[in-house]
């Protein structure tokens, strides 16, 4: 295992959070040390994981569950963090805490490592809806987008152009054809697509 010193993170990173940015942190098998002022959690114990009941994110839209992955588990006590998800025994698993004018989200399992080492964990039936974590973390940013989408496997990026327009790029990350609707925010209209097609109601087929 490793000992993480989050308080020793690059000063520029925490300075940006202090000024209003959002930071997301997930834990693998390390034992966090000295990060309570940043994350709002106080580590209580660390042990090899013996309980594998799913984590429930009751504070996230859709109340998804995530696999209790990772070789070790750290039990925490919330000090000033808001608990958004818990393990089966009620121990904090997904939290958010204020840091200056910004926020720090913390996930107590290495969901990214799980996805990179588990074939089909993104798109097969019963795959964990971990995308809901990122949508929750990025909610404020997404609110300022010109378009919104529904399909988790559809990636959408926006790029400002000098003309005051935005270039929208949509990519299907699933192995099958995908149909979704790109809903425009007020004040935006579609121009002629550079590639592919967009229906009058924003429907795309990729």
Language model regions located:
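A conserved amphipathic helix/loop scaffold
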Residues: 1-206
């Amino acid at each position: 295992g490793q000992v993480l010193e989050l308080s020793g993170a690059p000063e520029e990173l925490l300075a940006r959070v202090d000024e209003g940015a959002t930071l997301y942190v997930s834990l693998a098998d390390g034992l966090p040390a000295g990060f309570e002022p940043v994350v709002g959690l106080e580590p209580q114990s660390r042990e090899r994981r013996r309980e594998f009941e799913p984590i429930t994110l009751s504070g996230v839209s859709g109340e998804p569950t995530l696999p209790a992955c990772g070789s070790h588990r750290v039990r925490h006590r919330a000090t000033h963090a808001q608990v958004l998800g818990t393990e089966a025994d009620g121990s904090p698993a997904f939290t958010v805490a204020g840091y200056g004018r910004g926020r720090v989200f913390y996930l107590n399992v290495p969901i990214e490592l799980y996805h990179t080492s588990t074939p089909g964990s993104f798109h097969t039936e019963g795959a964990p809806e971990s995308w809901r974590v990122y949508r929750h973390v990025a909610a404020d940013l997404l609110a300022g987008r010109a378009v919104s989408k529904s399909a988790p496997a559809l990636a959408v990026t926006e790029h400002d152009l000098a003309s005051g327009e935005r270039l929208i790029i949509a990519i299907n990350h699933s192995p099958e054809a995908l149909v979704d609707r790109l809903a425009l925010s007020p004040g935006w209209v579609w121009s002629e697509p550079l590639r592919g097609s967009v229906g009058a109601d924003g429907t795309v087929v990729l």
